[in-house]
């Protein structure tokens, strides 16, 4: 049990996919202007990352490896992620049309979110078990959601702040993301 908790902490805080591995930067910068949208995107990505981790593990273990077709991993994982995203999109459209409209183009873009594919491939490369794959995917999505919501809150405050004209928009957003990355470096010695 301790191993799984450490895996979640390590994935969410220490080896955060956005701030350390620089995966998932497109939705990080694109959906982080309002907290409501960031929360919705975080929840959608959390579901997709967790289900994609399970699916990728099962497909690799029971189909690709026995057939010696591991060279097809990336292509198959992209297809699996696309199916999971389409399912998620249908569920969000039925349950919350407002959130569906707010997420707009970024919801289908989860398919091409490199963090989702990165988690699936890293699970296989690190030889995780099914349970570890699920926890790794959940921890990665937890870290992604945490960073996305914190960044959205900071961007909302910056929108109301008196920022010099030169730094308005993407400039101050990138500076803020860099400072967040430095802050998350403080978690480095947390897990040994």
Swiss-Prot record:
GO CC terms:
plasma membrane
Which residues are listed as membrane-spanning? 5-25, 39-59, 63-83, 102-122, 134-154, 171-191
For this protein, the record's InterPro entries field holds: Ion_transpt_RnfA/RsxA (IPR011293), NqrDE/RnfAE (IPR003667), NqrDE/RnfAE_oxidrdctase (IPR050133)
Say which enzyme class the record assigns.
translocase
Q: Which domain of life is it from?
A: Bacteria
Arranged from A to Z, the UniProt key words for this protein are: Cell inner membrane, Cell membrane, Electron transport, Membrane, Translocase, Transmembrane, Transmembrane helix, Transport
EC number(s) of the enzyme?
7.-.-.-
Q: What topology does it adopt in the membrane?
A: Multi-pass membrane protein
Q: Where in the cell is it found?
A: Cell inner membrane
A Gene Ontology biological process term: electron transport chain
The UniProt entry's sequence similarity note says:
Belongs to the NqrDE/RnfAE family.
Q: Could you tell me what this protein does? A: Part of a membrane-bound complex that couples electron transfer with translocation of ions across the membrane.
Q: Which NCBIfam families match?
A: PRK05151.1 (NF003481), rnfA (TIGR01943)
Q: How does it assemble?
A: The complex is composed of six subunits: RnfA, RnfB, RnfC, RnfD, RnfE and RnfG.
Protein name per UniProt: Ion-translocating oxidoreductase complex subunit A
Record organism:
Pasteurella multocida (strain Pm70)
What gene name is given for the protein in this entry?
rnfA
């Amino acid at each position: 049990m301790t191993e799984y908790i450490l895996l979640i902490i390590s994935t969410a805080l220490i080896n955060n996919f956005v701030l350390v591995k620089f995966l998932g930067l497109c939705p990080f910068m694109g959906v982080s202007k309002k907290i409501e949208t960031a929360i919705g995107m975080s929840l959608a990505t959390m579901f997709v990352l967790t289900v994609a981790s399970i699916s990728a593990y099962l497909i690799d273990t029971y189909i690709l490896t026995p057939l010696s077709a591991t060279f097809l991993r990336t292509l198959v994982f992209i297809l699996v992620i696309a199916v999971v995203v389409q399912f998620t999109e249908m569920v969000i459209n039925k349950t919350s049309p407002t959130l569906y409209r707010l997420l707009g183009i970024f919801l289908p873009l989860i398919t091409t979110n490199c963090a989702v594919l990165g988690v699936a491939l890293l699970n296989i490369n690190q030889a995780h078990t099914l349970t570890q794959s699920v926890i790794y995917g959940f921890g990665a999505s937890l870290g992604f959601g945490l960073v996305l919501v914190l960044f959205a809150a900071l961007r909302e405050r910056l929108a109301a702040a008196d920022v010099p004209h030169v730094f308005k928009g993407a400039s101050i957003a990138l500076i803020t993301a860099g400072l967040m990355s430095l802050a998350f470096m403080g978690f480095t010695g947390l897990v040994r």
